[in-house]
Each structure stands twice: as structure tokens, then as C-alpha cells.
Design a protein with these regions (language model features):
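Structured loop/turn residues at secondary-structure junctions
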Residues: 110-111, 163, 219, 260, ...
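C-terminal active-site/capping subdomain that shapes the small-molecule cofactor and substrate pocket
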Residues: 240, 252, 256-337
Length: 337
């Protein structure tokens, strides 16, 4: 059970600690501070990263994708101060060395929580629960909002899956519930990430050894494997692949599938327009940069929907792989509280 304390004005407060202040950790903080009213009762109570505090402050203030922070950012007495709000900064590679007895939830954003020993360091330090910002076999459960949130039953280590799975799973759940999915294939056209080099360099995956900004790079994605965990009723029915492209932000899922029923394009688009929540939609002829900073998990491009009389269906969705996912981290924190 999370330890919730009473705020001075009588509201319950959930104290959240961000471990790892990289792309997702910083985006989580930016999203929260831009609109804290969306997540009432959450307090960002601390940040930990192995980088120097000065670098943490600099990278938060000046962001190459989302632009500079419009308010004031400073370092004061070992804390990051944003528009007068002070957040303690820590610098350790081993989270279990900290005293987190007053923390309700650790957002594990280092990208390294692949083993149980690493994933539970926040618990060892005294925190109530851990939310991992990526796939992890060490998690007690993998949850995607809009797909399987009912799987949350008090588990202490929760994986928020991946940005691509958060885009794919709600679409697959809606389509399967309405028309039945026989089989399908999803390709994510994904912007480059920090896992790729800026110049050719050795890597375990040969295509990913090539300069990220110079080529389209066919590679793998964990989305199909994670979809099997999130929606076991579709286990083995969906294959997935990725193409990394020279774009800094916003990706898309191109989902082709065979359905049991025979929906029309209008029926499919009407269903996506009506659902709301983590699924957005657009009728406009947009390109990727137009979807930057959209908070939804996926935004359906209705003009791209295609259907054949034989049951072949194609749906296409945009997603800001950093901003949308960071919003889901905060939404999931609310669920866990």
C-alpha cells in the first residue's frame, strides 16, 4: 500500500522520485510542471542521475526537441529549482544507497532495470512502488493504459511497456473487441534514439551500427513481444518490425491486419473518433512534425485508413514517442496512487 501523506491544505499527496534524468525523465518533469493540474496530488520529490547537477539543469532548460524552458531554471543548494519549485538532486549509480522512505513511487527512467536486482533498488531504498519506463522482464506486470489497466492489482514493480506498445496496444484492443483480429503486421517508422550512433560505430545489431541521421535503418522492436504480455488473447497473431529514420521526434505505427468481421473505413474511423482517452484522431493531412508534443499515446490519421471487402484493414497512427509516453508515466502514477 502506498504511503500517502496529507498536504498542508488537506489534500493527499503522492511523492514521486525520478531515477534517471534522460530523455524520458526530463520529459516527465517538463510535462508535469507545464500542467500540474492534470495530475493533482502528485509531487516530484526528488531526482537522481549520474550526470553532474549542472548538466542536469542545462539539459532540462535547453531541449533540442521541445525548445527552451520558458520559465526560470537554477541550481540552489543541491536542488533543481524550476520557477521557484525546488526539487532535490542526487547523484548515485546505485539507487539502493539513498533513503527513499518517504517516497511513494520511483519512476525508474534509467533504461537499465532489466534485472530484478536493479528494478527493486527503489524498494530496497524504502520506496513504496516502482514504475519502469520501458520493457522489463523483472517487472511484476506490464501495463498499457487503454489496453489492460485492469491487470493492476497491487503489484509493486510495474512496467509501462514501451512508447510503441503504448501506441499499438490500444488500437489492437479496440479493433479486436469490435471486429476480431485474425492476424496482422505492424511496422513502426521510428525516429532515431540515443541507442544509435551519430557516426558509423560497432554495434550488436549491424544496421544500428550505421549513422542515425544518414539512413533509414531496418531493425527490431519489442512491441509484438510486449503486446503478447499486454493482450494475451492476441498472443502469436501480430508480428512487428521497425524502421529507424532521420527524424528527431514523432514516430508512427502502420498496422495491417486481417479481421473476422468486415468493417468499412467509415466504421473504423467512427470508432476511433468516439473512443477518446489515450487515442486521439485527426482528419487533417498532417506530417510528423505537426504531432510534436501531442499527449495522447497514439493519434489516428483517419485519411490513411484503408479496408478491403475481404477483411484486410490498414490503420495508421502518429505518436510522439517521448512526450506521449511521458504523459502516460504520469497517468500511470495516478493509477498506482
Amino acid at each position: 500500500v502506498l504511503r500517502l501523506r496529507e498536504a498542508a491544505r488537506g489534500e493527499r499527496v503522492m511523492r514521486v522520485f525520478i531515477n534517471g534524468f534522460g530523455r524520458i525523465g526530463r520529459s516527465v518533469l517538463r510535462a508535469f510542471l507545464q500542467d500540474p493540474g492534470r495530475w493533482p496530488g502528485i509531487e516530484i520529490a526528488g531526482i537522481n542521475d549520474i550526470a553532474a547537477p549542472e548538466m542536469c539543469a542545462y539539459l532540462f532548460e535547453y531541449d533540442s526537441v521541445f525548445g527552451p524552458w520558458r520559465g526560470k531554471v537554477a541550481l540552489e543548494g543541491g536542488a533543481l529549482v524550476v520557477d521557484g519549485r525546488s526539487i532535490p538532486l542526487h547523484r548515485t549509480a546505485d539507487l539502493s544507497r539513498l533513503d527513499l522512505a518517504g517516497i511513494d513511487l520511483v519512476m525508474e527512467c534509467t533504461g537499465r532495470a532489466e534485472t530484478r536486482e536493479v528494478a527493486e533498488r527503489g524498494l530496497v531504498a524504502g520506496a513504496g512502488r516502482v514504475l519502469i519506463s520501458g520493457p522489463s522482464a523483472a517487472a511484476d506486470v506490464t501495463v498499457v493504459l487503454g489496453a489492460n489497466e485492469t491487470a493492476l492489482t497491487g503489484q509493486r514493480i510495474v512496467s509501462n511497456a514501451s512508447c510503441t506498445t503504448n501506441a499499438l496496444a490500444p488500437l489492437a484492443r479496440l479493433i479486436h473487441d469490435r471486429w476480431g483480429i485474425v492476424t496482422g503486421s505492424m511496422t513502426t517508422v521510428h525516429c532515431y534514439t540515443g541507442s544509435q550512433p551519430t557516426v558509423d560505430a560497432p554495434a550488436a545489431d549491424y544496421p544500428r551500427s550505421r549513422a542515425a541521421a544518414l539512413s533509414m535503418v531496418p531493425t527490431t522492436t519489442s512491441a509484438a513481444r510486449l503486446l503478447d504480455r499486454v493482450l494475451p488473447q492476441l498472443a502469436g497473431r501480430i508480428v512487428a518490425q521497425a524502421v529507424r529514420v532521420p527524424v528527431a521526434s514523432v514516430s508512427c505505427v502502420d498496422f495491417h491486419l486481417l479481421t473476422e468481421a468486415r468493417p468499412t473505413v467509415d466504421e473504423v474511423n467512427a470508432a476511433f473518433r468516439a473512443v477518446g482517452g489515450v487515442i486521439g484522431w485527426t482528419d487533417r493531412p498532417l506530417v510528423s512534425t505537426d504531432l510534436r508534443s501531442r499527449p495522447e499515446s497514439v493519434i489516428m490519421a483517419c485519411p490513411e485508413t484503408k479496408a478491403t471487402p475481404g477483411g484486410m484493414l490498414r490503420v495508421f497512427g502518429w505518436y510522439d514517442n517521448e512526450w506521449g509516453f511521458s504523459n502516460r508515466m504520469l497517468d500511470m502514477a495516478m493509477r498506482l496512487g
